């Protein structure tokens, strides 16, 4: 009897011990809250000049030795590899492993890397740190680990699903984006990564965010698959007042496309990581905003309460739309943010920045709350980000969606059948969708259109498109002042029934 009591006590002690210690976002939040109450300490670079001053081609020579991947000798589907410091990745981040019983720092060693032709003194790099890390997982085939997550630089991270290649990025937080005061880029200064079990299909990552005016604690649960979904929880604390807080920011690139053709001859018809901002507003409306590469900074704001979702999408997957064998823009994912709970009043904001080439991310989208708490008070945001190539499920299932937007010189067909430019700009917008395809060809589909004070709609026509089994809107617009932007909206209806999402377009200035 005494032996049974002793065994019971031992079992209870074991259960208590294993359940009483568990790392959580609250452990990170304590650090973030403590940091918020102190003055900001800028990170110090410990990088030798040979690495700090190197060119990108040299930095690319520094490769992680795949044979030394972290967890390589463990029966887990996830593996970790690390980024070396170099160029503007000049400050180290701390990376920790979380097990069932402890937290252990993953120490830097130059032995993890091959340096190619980069000459360096081993003694000068022995005490460096990592610039970031990547996660590998057998997402495309069971016998091969492929990279699915990259966390490198500021609070940026990139994620892909099966059959995808890296494109747009997500971020932890954006501060004062597009404001005259200049943008502040918070950075993840420390990570904690839970060691996965052999049967785990998800990976949990915690991160501590820091910047001059904000700190934060983050929990990312990565669920790889055909679509890779990242479940995000954040606790944010302001050190000082900010002009604008960008929550769940997405960063992408748009250089040119059919709504804004390339000014120079280019064999690629389109060049972009994303071609539109999609919004599912709190009132149920779906909005599609084609992206631009403007000549001047452009900011668009969509006010609403409790957004149901937003994302930067890559609509149109045919290779013929891109014709790029090297960069495979047709395989780059869309990213869709789904808020959890009520986010209150605020705006989905789109920032479009001029760029001359595809190496610059010039598109940013995020949620910005109308009201921010006083410094030190906690803000909580929960959401998922879905990285997908299946855009069919990223719009209203019962409404038509915009398949493409094309811009052209407006013209009128003369009696001799020759088209004569009439000083207008023509927009050709194709709508399609599963429900729309069921409509008879003679359905009296019309368009509800509107334009801002800087323009006039000269003509608007809708006709059936037998190729897409949808309807095509052609709208000819006259701009009053080319130095100003021109806003326009359109949606397809049948009597009092709305058939499509709302096409919302901004014609940039000086176009």
Swiss-Prot record:
Pathway: Glycan metabolism; osmoregulated periplasmic glucan (OPG) biosynthesis. Pfam families: MdoG. Keywords: Periplasm, Signal. Residues 1-22 form the signal peptide. One of its GO terms (biological process) is beta-glucan biosynthetic process. GO terms for cellular component: outer membrane-bounded periplasmic space. InterPro entries: Gal_mutarotase_sf_dom, GH-type_carb-bd, Glucan_biosyn_MdoG/MdoD, Glucan_biosyn_MdoG_C, Ig-like_fold, Ig_E-set, MdoG_OpgG. It is found in: Periplasm. Gene3D superfamilies: 2.70.98.10, Immunoglobulins. GO terms for molecular function: carbohydrate binding; catalytic activity. The keyword Metal-binding does not apply. The keyword Nucleus does not apply. Belongs to the OpgD/OpgG family. Involved in the biosynthesis of osmoregulated periplasmic glucans (OPGs). This is Glucans biosynthesis protein G. It comes from Shigella dysenteriae serotype 1 (strain Sd197). The gene is mdoG.
């Amino acid at each position: 009897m005494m032996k049974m009591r002793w065994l019971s006590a031992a079992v209870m002690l074991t259960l208590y011990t294993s359940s009483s210690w568990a790392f959580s976002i609250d452990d990170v939040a304590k650090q973030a809250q403590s940091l918020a109450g102190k003055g900001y300490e800028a990170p110090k670079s410990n990088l030798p000049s040979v690495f700090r001053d190197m060119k990108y081609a040299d930095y690319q020579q520094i490769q992680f030795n795949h044979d030394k991947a972290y967890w390589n000798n463990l029966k887990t589907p996830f593996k970790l590899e690390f980024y070396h410091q170099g160029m503007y990745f000049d400050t180290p981040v701390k990376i920790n492993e979380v097990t069932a019983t402890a937290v252990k720092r993953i120490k830097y060693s130059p032995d993890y890397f091959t340096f190619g032709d980069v000459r360096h003194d081993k003694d000068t790099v022995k005490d460096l740190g990592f610039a970031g890390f990547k996660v590998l997982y057998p997402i495309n085939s069971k016998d091969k680990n492929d990279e699915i997550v990259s966390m490198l630089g500021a609070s940026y991270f990139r994620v892909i699903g099966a059959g995808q290649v890296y494109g747009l990025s997500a971020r932890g937080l954006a501060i004062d984006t597009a404001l005259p005061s200049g943008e502040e880029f918070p950075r993840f200064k420390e990570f904690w990564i839970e060691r996965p079990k052999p049967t785990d299909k998800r990976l949990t990552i915690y991160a501590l965010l820091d910047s001059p005016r904000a700190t934060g604690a983050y929990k990312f649960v990565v669920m790889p698959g055909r679509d890779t979904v990242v479940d995000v929880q954040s606790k944010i604390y302001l050190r000082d007042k900010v002009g604008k807080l960008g929550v769940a920011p997405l960063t992408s690139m748009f250089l040119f496309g059919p709504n804004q053709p390339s000014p120079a001859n280019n064999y690629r018809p389109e060049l972009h990581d994303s071609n539109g901002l999609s919004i599912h507003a709190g009132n149920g409306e779906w909005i599609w905003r084609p992206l631009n590469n403007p000549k001047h900074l452009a900011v668009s704001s969509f006010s609403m309460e409790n957004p149901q979702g937003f994302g930067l999408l890559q609509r149109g997957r045919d290779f013929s739309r891109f014709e790029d064998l090297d960069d495979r823009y047709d395989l780059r994912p869309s990213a869709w943010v789904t808020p959890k709970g009520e986010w209150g009043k605020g705006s989905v904001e789109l920032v479009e920045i001029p760029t001359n080439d595809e190496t610059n991310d010039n598109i940013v989208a995020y949620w910005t709350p109308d009201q921010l708490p006083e410094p030190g008070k906690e803000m909580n945001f929960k959401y998922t980000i879905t990285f997908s190539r299946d855009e069919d499920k990223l719009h209203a299932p019962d409404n038509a969606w915009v398949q493409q937007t094309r811009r052209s010189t407006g013209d009128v067909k003369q009696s001799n059948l020759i088209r004569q430019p009439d000083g207008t700009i023509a927009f050709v917008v194709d709508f399609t969708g599963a429900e729309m395809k069921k409509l008879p060809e003679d359905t009296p589909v019309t368009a509800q259109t509107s334009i801002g004070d800087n323009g006039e709609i000269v003509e608007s026509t809708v006709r059936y498109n037998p190729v897409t089994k949808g309807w095509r809107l052609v709208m000819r617009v006259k701009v009053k002042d080319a130095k100003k932007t021109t806003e326009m909206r359109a949606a397809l209806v049948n009597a009092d029934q709305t058939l499509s999402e709302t096409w919302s377009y901004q014609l940039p200035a000086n176009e």
